[in-house]
């Protein structure tokens, strides 16, 4: 990690200084409220939960109050309780150091260093006071950018990517949040560190670099989620579908439904049932989709 970026991440902001000295924010009652599933919740004012970094390395630097056209990147304030609230946006939390105890839709979760948490819109959650070494960064995609644009792009890449995007969306729709067990992942901290360095010491192409790093982070989180599923997630009892999709993706030009069934020692009918259940598409539809996407990619390159 760049020492300058580490310094700016860990330096107390003026608001954090006040919270550490005992100041308690009392403006929650003045925030707008919204009915959600029969319960009234506070809609969080983003400027309260997140700490602006006043000691920026340069006047033009966004620090960790980076406001881009599609995403915002902010540091969560330490030493202050954030009571139960909801957002009108999706939020992605990353713990740079320490840990972060939260209650998400009634479920206590302690987010550990290098883990990532995706919180859906209108999901009630609260955050316990963060300590001196507890640094959590929030990435806030604008409107429906994450699902309507970025996830759609991944879905178009391959049948396997489409499967994982569908799984992530279904999990988030059902539970309203998704924890990525990325604490031992090699790439996630590396990509986030590069993102922070670009925020604190922006280059000429800073906006493009930040957006591409965000895209890369989301791509790696799909890999993390695949690992979670294969090791014992909600699809573990039918985890054969993951290697099956990978096999089809690699051999779509020559494989048949029968050859896929033979390779995995199951019946051709079971191939179709599995694929339909977990992807919503038949074997033929998946192969055709892969062929069309491959052709489209070739056309883009010519």
Sequence positions of predicted segments:
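N-terminal accessory regions of nucleic-acid-interacting proteins
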Residues: 32-39
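N-terminal positioning helix adjacent to the helix-turn-helix/winged-helix DNA-binding module
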Residues: 184, 236-244, 279, 288-291
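An amphipathic alpha-helical interaction segment
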Residues: 179-230
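Basic/polar phosphate-binding segments, predominantly the helix-turn-helix DNA-binding elements
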Residues: 250-254, 258-293, 298-302
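A hydrophobic/aromatic-rich effector-binding and dimerization subdomain
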Residues: 2-11, 15-19, 24-30, 49-50, ...
């Amino acid at each position: 990690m760049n020492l300058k970026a580490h310094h700016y991440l860990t330096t107390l902001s003026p608001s954090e200084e006040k919270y550490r000295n005992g100041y308690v924010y009392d403006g929650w009652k003045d925030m707008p409220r919204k009915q959600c599933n029969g319960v009234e919740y506070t809609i969080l004012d983003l400027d309260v939960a997140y700490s602006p970094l006043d000691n920026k390395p340069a006047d033009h630097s966004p620090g960790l109050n980076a406001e881009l056209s599609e995403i915002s990147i902010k540091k969560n304030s330490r030493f202050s309780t954030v009571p139960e609230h909801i957002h009108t946006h999706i939020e992605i939390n990353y713990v740079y150091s320490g840990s972060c105890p939260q209650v998400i839709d009634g479920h206590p979760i302690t987010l550990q260093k290098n883990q990532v948490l995706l919180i859906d819109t209108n999901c009630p959650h609260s955050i316990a006071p963060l300590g001196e070494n507890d640094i959590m960064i929030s990435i806030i995609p604008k409107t429906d950018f994450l699902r309507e644009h970025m996830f759609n792009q991944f879905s178009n890449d391959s049948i396997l990517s489409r499967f994982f995007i569908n799984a992530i969306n279904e999990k988030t729709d059902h539970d309203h949040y998704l924890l990525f067990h990325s604490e031992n992942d090699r790439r996630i901290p590396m990509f986030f560190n590069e993102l922070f360095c670009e925020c604190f010491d922006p280059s000429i192409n800073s906006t493009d670099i930040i957006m591409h790093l965000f895209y890369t982070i989301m791509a790696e989180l799909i890999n993390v989620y695949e690992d979670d599923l294969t090791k014992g997630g909600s699809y573990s009892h039918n985890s054969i579908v993951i290697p099956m999709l990978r096999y089809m993706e690699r051999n779509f030009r020559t494989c048949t439904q029968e050859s896929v069934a033979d390779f995995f020692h199951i019946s051709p009918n079971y191939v179709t049932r599995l694929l339909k259940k977990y992807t919503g598409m038949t074997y033929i539809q998946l192969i055709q989709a892969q062929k069309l996407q491959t052709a489209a990619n070739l056309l883009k390159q010519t």
